[in-house]
């Protein structure tokens, strides 16, 4: 999805990616997963890597065990290339392996393999 955003005082055209992933059905694991994604606990190398591959903004929402992630990128962003590169950056594989404890995903899977793209089925824009 391409959208226009105001960044500072400039208008920017961006792509938006929406993805989903399920967590294991364990209140303790979910609480720990939330903690690990807090500003105080997130690994700096992971945040730096996300920015380094060109991701402008990322948000993750949760409902029960279901995660919903919104990623905004420049319009010339190539998802597959960026995710391949991200997987080679410092501590990324270690982070993914650690996160697999909480996620309904097999150990050794990359972020791109775990998070499933969602299809937009409705939109309403102001005209």
List each model region and its residues.
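Short, conserved, surface-exposed binding loops centered on an aromatic residue
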Residues: 10, 52, 59-61
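Eukaryote-biased recognition of C-terminal alpha-helical segments
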Residues: 114-122
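Short, well-ordered beta-strand segments in beta-rich or mixed alpha/beta enzyme
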Residues: 17-22, 56-89
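Single conserved hydrophobic/aromatic residue that forms the stacking wall/gate
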Residues: 1-8, 13
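An amphipathic, aromatic/His-enriched active-site/gating alpha helix that lines ligand/cofactor pockets
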Residues: 53, 74-114
